[in-house]
Every structure is written in structure tokens, then in C-alpha cells.
Amino acid sequence: MSAHQDVKKVVLAYSGGLDTSVILRWLQKTYNCEVVTFTADLGQGEELEPARKKAEMFGVKEIFVEDLRETFVKDFVFPMFRANTLYEGQYLLGTSIARPLIAQRQIEIAEAVGADAVAHGATGKGNDQVRFELGYYSLKPDVKVIAPWREWDLTSRTKLLAFAEENQIPVTKDKRGEAPFSVDANLLHSSSEGKLLEDPSIGAEEIVFQRTISPEAAPDVATEITIDFVSGDPVAINGVEMTPATLLTRLNELGRDNGIGRLDIVENRFVGMKSRGIYETPGGTILLAAHRSIESITLDREAAHLKDSIMPRYAEIIYNGFWFSPERRMLQALIDTSQHSVTGRVRMRLYKGNVTCVGRESPHSLYDTRVVTFEDDEGAYNQQDAQGFIKLNALRLRLGGQIGRRGGTL
């Protein structure tokens, strides 16, 4: 029996677009199996009912279209932001953080419907194939994974369109021509890559930006907002409590209107190549600045520095697709422990692409005006204590300096 004959039912991560519609029909023809479609609403801003109708058109009997926006923000985005996560110092991981949830629900659906395989539409060049499959294998080690882009001979857009035509797959007019760039989006961000953007020496045209106005076109008057945090997570804007997805949606609107969150980056993919991307993360950019600001008065110095030191590793773990790994869980436990006192309010000023904290307060603030004042501190801090502190810290430097002088190295 061939490997194709072993598969009776497969759960496909299905967007309803050209690529995954071709994959759906290809699975039916190549594997002669039942296909179950799963479409996740992660806030990508697209109408998802057409995906359901298209799946029905292909004879799919079990169709899952789910609104996962709240779960996405609460259980994936917010835990990541507690760490102030940036990959290679810049990227807020908007694509990376969406893949574990999709993989998780695919496996849950596969087990619920008795499927023996899962499939995705990620290409063989990118990171997403790794992220999806590491998620699958973490949650169901014996699952069979079908990655059509690594199997089929549809190696060009011309071949994809020809397959679509042969199999009566509807193709919208805008998909018939070569798209100038590829877009991926969710509630946290949008990314644009490829084709028009492949030359990193050429700046992106304004048409590329999907979610933000240009900073130059932003209002000439700053917008000020307050964000309330409880245990490291944002809970309210301007005093109005909101659900996680609603709050991020509102921050996206504020960031969009003020030209905030644009990034043009060349990053190092896990698979080995460098990739140029245009990212827009308006709400996330505000949230990162706000979270760091409330931490500045609530975290102990050494705890804050330790947290900053592990952040690059934590970011790399998520970027590479190891969300369900023991090392990510270990680091998450440490990060979450640090957030117990990260409660309070910050006031942020949004202006022409910039986010600035202009005020912060917390019932757990470690900032003591009695100690730091330039006026009489009434004995709160004895400046003479600094002499011994400096001498002890200088001891190794003085000893090293003496040896260096004797050896002629100073």
C-alpha cells in the first residue's frame, strides 16, 4: 500500500485563497481522501464565509470556520509581550506567533473527526513549514503531515493557474496576474514580502503599506492615551476595560492613525536564507513601549536585566517554531513570575510614527522620590555610603591596574 493510500482523512489549514484551494483539490485527487477544512479568524480582516462556500463547492462535508481572535491575543500575543519580545532587535514576531494556535486547533480537530493527517500551504523555502510541523509533532507525535509544496510539480504561478482552470477552481481577476508582493495578516500585524520587495536596496512604495498611514500624513497634533496593566497584561485604554482582542484592535486603530509601527527589515530565516519584509504592527508597537514603561518602575533592576538578557533567546525560540517546547515553557514561567508586580497605568503620546511615555504610576512602584530627590532627603540616603561601595567595586580594577603597570601593558 502506498503512502497516499494510507491517508483516509486530512485536516487542511484553509484560507480559501488560490493556493490552499488548489491544495484542497490536489489532496482529493492525489490522495483520494476526505478533506476537512479549518479556517481560523485571527483578525486578518478578510471575510471568511467565502472560504466556507468554496469548501462546500469542492464537496467538503466537515468545515470548521472559527473566530480565534480572543484566544490568539490572550494566550499567545500577551504572553509574548510580557517578555518585550523582539527577534533580532526589531521584529515583533507577528507571523511567528500565529502559527502555534493554528497548528494546535488543527490537531484538536484532527483528533475530534478521526483524521489521520494534517496539511498546510506553507512553501518549502519559508519558516512557516517548520513552525506548523514542529507544532503538529509536539502535540501529536505520530501524526502524518502533508506539505504539498514539497511534493507536487506545481512549481510556478502559471502551473497553479492552469491546475485551477482544469479543476474549475474560481480565480479572481486580481489573482490572474503576478501579484506585486505577498501579504500575510492577523490582528497583531501584517507582513508584505517577495517580488516587488525582493531588492533590499529599493525602498517600499506607499502601496505596500496595508495598515498604517505614513508618518508624514499623520496628524500634526499628538494623541495622548492611558493604558492600564494588571500583572503584565494590558486591560484598559483611557480607563475603559476591554477584552484582549478588542484592546489590541483599538491600539491598532490609534497606531494606524498616527503612522506608528512600520518596519523594513532583512531578517535571518531559520531555514538559512535572509529575507526582506515590510511589517506593520501599529498596536503592538504601542503595547511594547507601554509595557516597558510600566516595568521601568515596577521591576527590580537585576530582575529587569535578567529578563532582558533572556529575551533574545525567547524570541528566537518563537521565531523558529518551538512554542510548545520545554525551553519556551521554562522561560515563560520565569517571565510570568516577573510580572506579578507589573500593575499600573502609563500615559503614552503618539505622534507621527513615534510612541513616547510621558507618565507612569503603580501601587507597586519602586521609584522613591525621597531617595532620588535633589533636595534634602532627610536621611533617606546617606551619600557617605557610596565611598565604600565604590572602593569595593574598584578593588579588582586597582589590582589589575597594578599588575598591568608592572607588566608594561598600561
UniProtKB/Swiss-Prot annotation:
The keyword Membrane does not apply. It is found in: Cytoplasm. One of its GO terms (molecular function) is ATP binding. GO terms for biological process: argininosuccinate metabolic process; L-arginine biosynthetic process; urea cycle. It holds the Pfam family Arginosuc_syn_C. L-citrulline binds at Y91, S96, N127, R131, S182, S191, E267, Y279. Keywords: Amino-acid biosynthesis, Arginine biosynthesis, ATP-binding, Cytoplasm, Ligase, Nucleotide-binding. Pathway: Amino-acid biosynthesis; L-arginine biosynthesis; L-arginine from L-ornithine and carbamoyl phosphate: step 2/3. ATP binds at A13, Y14, S15, G16, G17, L18, D19, T20, S21, A40, G121. GO terms for cellular component: cytoplasm. It catalyses: L-citrulline + L-aspartate + ATP = 2-(N(omega)-L-arginino)succinate + AMP + diphosphate + H(+). Its EC number is 6.3.4.5. Its main location: cytoplasm. L-aspartate binds at T123, N127, D128. The keyword Cell membrane does not apply. SUPFAM superfamilies: Adenine nucleotide alpha hydrolases-like, Argininosuccinate synthetase, C-terminal domain. It is an enzyme of class 6 (ligase). InterPro entries: Arginosuc_syn_C, Arginosuc_syn_N, Arginosuc_synth, Arginosuc_synth_CS, Arginosuc_synth_type_1_subfam, AS_cat/multimer_dom_body, Rossmann-like_a/b/a_fold. It comes from the Bacteria. Belongs to the argininosuccinate synthase family. Type 1 subfamily. Homotetramer. This is Argininosuccinate synthase. It comes from Gluconobacter oxydans (strain 621H) (Gluconobacter suboxydans).
